[in-house]
Amino acid sequence: MAEITAQMVKELREITGLGMMECKKALTEASGDMKAAEDLLRIKSGAKASKAAGRTAAEGIVAAHIARDGKSGALVEVNCETDFVARNEDFIGFAHSLAELLTTESIGDNEALANARLSNGESVEEFRKALVMKLGENISIRRFARHQVAGAQDRLASYLHGAKIGVMVDYTGGDPALGKDLAMHIAASKPVCVSSEQVSPELLERERQIYTAQAAESGKPADIVARMVDGRIAKYLAEITLLGQPFVKNPDQTVKQLLAEKSAQVNGFTLYIVGEGIEKKSGDFAAEVMAQVGQAKQEKAS
């Protein structure tokens, strides 16, 4: 049986919001499998699914850029080791340079991006290595997405929340104000996809199994259990899909209703949350403090 560490219990508590002993027991029953332990706790406690895909742990920023003609745009997440470096002007400038580059060039993967040239003539990888040497931290380009509108009436809108959450949305109809509202809504409500048709069958089946197990414990007849499960699935889909969510600026109206009112539609979106799904090593806080102290000493000496 896998050893159940205090760090594992802490992580499961952060995901579920449940007590230490409950989490430890679930991890023991699941032989240390974090996902299986979360499912066990949800079945037993009726807890909701964790909205976040993972714990936000790594540092860095999200940068966005949209071309002047509004036809193309890009979102990129660049990671570093401490929040101190994430606020550094050179680091921020690098991230924004990448967003601009990705807007103008169709780049398919990280390898191609590493070999692409920035406006100063250096390759992205050369500039990244120089920045690592200058700032003394590992710097990585985690992910990026390029949007290219298809039709004359299509638009792009972006929103950055403290550079830690970034959104780019591709929509048709409406006006720039609608685009901004949609991007802000996505940042706040964090939908998984646009509509229920886009929810992965695997995710839906996992939720159905959990809801079925929860409902079965009620002891009610099978037909009532089936209706309970269908109702919970419908509610779940409304929570995770953009069209089903209540609009943040008017909760009495769903996003689907808002779009119908504006004769508009959402073609797709990208949502990045810095460090989502990346785990920090234990002791990172102390390391971050020491890194900041060391950086301050270097700046004072120079």
From Swiss-Prot:
Localization terms from the record: Cytoplasm
Keywords assigned by UniProt, alphabetized: Cytoplasm, Elongation factor, Protein biosynthesis
Coiled coil segments of this chain: none
Molecular functions per Gene Ontology: translation elongation factor activity
Annotated spans, Involved in Mg(2+) ion dislocation from EF-Tu: 82-85
Main localization, broad class: cytoplasm
CDD domains listed in its UniProt record: UBA_EF-Ts
InterPro entries found in the cross-reference section: EF-Ts_dimer_sf, Transl_elong_EFTs/EF1B, Transl_elong_EFTs/EF1B_dimer, Transl_elong_Ts_CS, UBA-like_sf
Cellular component annotations (GO), alphabetically ordered: cytoplasm
Domain of life: Bacteria
A family per Pfam: EF_TS
PANTHER family: ELONGATION FACTOR TS, ELONGATION FACTOR TS, MITOCHONDRIAL
Family of the protein in this entry: Belongs to the EF-Ts family.
Function: Associates with the EF-Tu.GDP complex and induces the exchange of GDP to GTP. It remains bound to the aminoacyl-tRNA.EF-Tu.GTP complex up to the GTP hydrolysis stage on the ribosome.
Name of the featured protein: Elongation factor Ts
Organism: Nitrosospira multiformis (strain ATCC 25196 / NCIMB 11849 / C 71)
Encoding gene per record: tsf
